[in-house]
Amino acid sequence: MLRLLASGCARGPGPGVGARPAAGLFHPGRRQSRQASDAPRNQPPSPEFVARPVGVCSMMRLPVQTSPEGLDAAFIGVPLDTGTSNRPGARFGPRRIREESVMLGTVNPSTGALPFQSLMVADLGDVNVNLYNLQDSCRRIQEAYEKIVAAGCIPLTLGGDHTITYPILQAMAKKHGPVGLLHVDAHTDTTDKALGEKLYHGAPFRRCVDEGLLDCKRVVQIGIRGSSTTLDPYRYNRSQGFRVVLAEDCWMKSLVPLMGEVRQQMGGKPIYISFDIDALDPAYAPGTGTPEIAGLTPSQALEIIRGCQGLNVMGCDLVEVSPPYDLSGNTALLAANLLFEMLCALPKVTTV
């Protein structure tokens, strides 16, 4: 089930970019439906008329709904870090990402994307996870996402540790069959088990392979790096047909050519984007649980996500933001921007 955010959460669209709200309290209006094509779509409020600190702490200050009905896409928080192996704190990621999203606008001048003129978008609050039982949390996540996907709504997820991608992909595969995967991360997350446990943030994609959730010939992992306990830590991945792009193969270069190859590999079938913030160098994203040096840059992250435009993206997540290690808030700010870029890359988003 989905749970609304803290008290004061309302549902319905906020004031449009060109609309001036009444003086005094900021009150979102009634919910709109995508079925009414001539009806105005939800719009984040313009700072020209509504001060950034004003309103409910939702993603981009969008309306908060309890149901995915009528939505083309939605932001969902999964505040879970029970599966972490090093630094905790990712359970606070969704809240902090939402806080930092107030700086985001409604259009993307760099790509020409007009997401809020193309899609009905809202914030669906958080999945009500069980912090004391990881298996039960995964069940709750899967059930919540099955409802979201069944409604025809594309989920954009605020994590949470990387364990959450496993139940999300269970829900995705239930509707779409095995999906392609663009996985941006410092780690492959295909370890079989740790301390006897097969369910944690280092193993989600191993579990996905075990259950046939992935179209393994359409899995690309970018940004992989770090020390290991073996000299060939990527043998399993390559044996499954994954393409593994190491971080050092990305150093000092544009990733636009790489993403051209990725688009050809993915084709027109459904794909899922899973972005671990530790793919980025800790100079840019220190607030994460398992940082690795010599990572990607923010501009490369933009090239990767923008390179997905035109693909059949059925869902996205941004995981592993740990606010206790993000003293400046820059990691969450970066995460919020990357989620906006994912929204802009979704199918049916108009570009000019």
From Swiss-Prot:
<keyword id="KW-0378">Hydrolase</keyword>
<keyword id="KW-0479">Metal-binding</keyword>
<dbReference type="GO" id="GO:0046872">
    <property type="term" value="F:metal ion binding"/>
</dbReference>
<feature type="binding site">
    <location>
        <position position="187"/>
    </location>
    <ligand>
        <name>Mn(2+) 2</name>
    </ligand>
</feature>
<dbReference type="InterPro" id="IPR005925">
    <property type="entry name" value="Agmatinase-rel"/>
</dbReference>
<keyword id="KW-0496">Mitochondrion</keyword>
<dbReference type="InterPro" id="IPR006035">
    <property type="entry name" value="Ureohydrolase"/>
</dbReference>
<comment type="function">
    <text>Hydrolyzes linear guanidino acids to form urea and the corresponding amines. Displays specificity for substrates having a negatively charged head group and short chains including taurocyamine, guanidino propanoic and butanoic acids. May protect cells by detoxifying potentially harmful amounts of guanidino acids. Metabolizes L-arginine with low efficiency.</text>
</comment>
<feature type="binding site">
    <location>
        <position position="185"/>
    </location>
    <ligand>
        <name>Mn(2+) 1</name>
    </ligand>
</feature>
<feature type="modified residue" description="N6-acetyllysine">
    <location>
        <position position="193"/>
    </location>
</feature>
<feature type="modified residue" description="N6-succinyllysine; alternate">
    <location>
        <position position="217"/>
    </location>
</feature>
<feature type="region of interest" description="Disordered">
    <location>
        <begin position="11"/>
        <end position="49"/>
    </location>
</feature>
<keyword id="KW-0464">Manganese</keyword>
<feature type="binding site">
    <location>
        <position position="162"/>
    </location>
    <ligand>
        <name>Mn(2+) 1</name>
    </ligand>
</feature>
<dbReference type="GO" id="GO:0004053">
    <property type="term" value="F:arginase activity"/>
</dbReference>
<dbReference type="GO" id="GO:0033389">
    <property type="term" value="P:putrescine biosynthetic process from arginine, via agmatine"/>
</dbReference>
<feature type="binding site">
    <location>
        <position position="185"/>
    </location>
    <ligand>
        <name>Mn(2+) 2</name>
    </ligand>
</feature>
<feature type="binding site">
    <location>
        <position position="189"/>
    </location>
    <ligand>
        <name>Mn(2+) 1</name>
    </ligand>
</feature>
<comment type="similarity">
    <text>Belongs to the ureohydrolase superfamily. Arginase family.</text>
</comment>
<dbReference type="InterPro" id="IPR023696">
    <property type="entry name" value="Ureohydrolase_dom_sf"/>
</dbReference>
<dbReference type="InterPro" id="IPR020855">
    <property type="entry name" value="Ureohydrolase_Mn_BS"/>
</dbReference>
<dbReference type="GO" id="GO:0000050">
    <property type="term" value="P:urea cycle"/>
</dbReference>
<dbReference type="GO" id="GO:0008783">
    <property type="term" value="F:agmatinase activity"/>
</dbReference>
<comment type="pathway">
    <text>Nitrogen metabolism; urea cycle; L-ornithine and urea from L-arginine: step 1/1.</text>
</comment>
<dbReference type="Pfam" id="PF00491">
    <property type="entry name" value="Arginase"/>
</dbReference>
<feature type="modified residue" description="N6-acetyllysine; alternate">
    <location>
        <position position="217"/>
    </location>
</feature>
<keyword id="KW-0056">Arginine metabolism</keyword>
<keyword id="KW-0007">Acetylation</keyword>
<keyword id="KW-0809">Transit peptide</keyword>
<feature type="binding site">
    <location>
        <position position="276"/>
    </location>
    <ligand>
        <name>Mn(2+) 2</name>
    </ligand>
</feature>
<feature type="binding site">
    <location>
        <position position="276"/>
    </location>
    <ligand>
        <name>Mn(2+) 1</name>
    </ligand>
</feature>
<feature type="binding site">
    <location>
        <position position="278"/>
    </location>
    <ligand>
        <name>Mn(2+) 2</name>
    </ligand>
</feature>
<dbReference type="GO" id="GO:0047971">
    <property type="term" value="F:guanidinobutyrase activity"/>
</dbReference>
<dbReference type="GO" id="GO:0005739">
    <property type="term" value="C:mitochondrion"/>
</dbReference>
<dbReference type="GO" id="GO:0047972">
    <property type="term" value="F:guanidinopropionase activity"/>
</dbReference>
<protein>
    <recommendedName>
        <fullName>Guanidino acid hydrolase, mitochondrial</fullName>
        <ecNumber>3.5.3.-</ecNumber>
        <ecNumber>3.5.3.1</ecNumber>
        <ecNumber>3.5.3.7</ecNumber>
        <ecNumber>3.5.3.17</ecNumber>
    </recommendedName>
</protein>
<dbReference type="GO" id="GO:0097055">
    <property type="term" value="P:agmatine biosynthetic process"/>
</dbReference>
<feature type="transit peptide" description="Mitochondrion">
    <location>
        <begin position="1"/>
        <end position="35"/>
    </location>
</feature>
